[in-house]
Amino acid sequence: MKSIRNKLSLATCSLLTTGNAAAEAIENAWETDASYLYYSEVDRVTVNKLVGAAKGFVSAKDTASIKVVFDSMSGATPTGAVNSSSLSYTGASGGSGITPSGESGALSNFDDTRVGVALDWAHEHTRTLTVNYNGAFSVENDRRSFSVAATANKENSSRSLRWTLGIAGTYDQIFRVNGNNTPEPLTRVEDQRFLGEGERTTTDVIAGLTSVINRRTTAQLNLSFGIANGYMTDPYKVFSIVDVNGVEWDQYFEGRPDSRMRWSIAAKLNHMTFPGNNGMHLTYRYYSDDWDIKSHTLDYAHRFIFGNADYLEPRIRLYTQNKAEFYPN
């Protein structure tokens, strides 16, 4: 079960020098921010999310930031099975039980809590070269995740072009809440055959180019490539074996491939209109992987400015995706 997703901000500093003195001092101004999100879908899911962040200069060429996230999700999620009146199922919270008569075995309840911390350090090596170093970890009821990343941004002398190159690595441990294990793929749910914790490693590389076309227009192009190896299966998902009439005979734990290679290309155009200084933001993204999944995303936002502090920003997003090669018809 995957879900949900990320955003940040900036700070200032002053360099003070005194007459003939060679020493320099940094006025270390830190910014702090906090936010709370509540989201609910009737008879489906409820989300509570609390975020705290701080960022500031630690030297004339270095900035540091920390972000802490606490969120909880509860509700119901599809199991992958067809509707049933009596077969066993495993819930997304890790608990197992029998679907009561008259209820749908295609849904199960879940209750998940996550705590995450992200650290960032940015160093200005030269006037036109900055490198960001990142580290993060998160702990959930059924997952532990650790990641590191480094991204270099190089500008030309006029700062009208910026090249970006980044690499990231992630290590995940996946398990079910009760038992700290994962079901053996493609085995009957009724047999309750389990293995140890699942492990997955992921490596991602991104290359990008940002260009200032004119004083009101910028364009951006990003290419990304990623490889994941290890446990790729959702330990709570099952599928049903049915007869020609659609009546369920049995349930099996799902089993996905143990590797995945993916790539994407994204293009973005930002333009400020004249007169009015309204903002136009157009983004297109194409994604493909070796599971035969392909997707197209088109996103457009238009910001209408009213006075100095007020604005209205309608947004439209179009998305299409096909199914994986192993997904049943």
What are these regions (language model features)?
Residues L37-S40, E103-L107, N134-V139, A149-N153, ...:
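Extracellular loop and loop/strand-boundary signature of outer-membrane beta-barrel proteins
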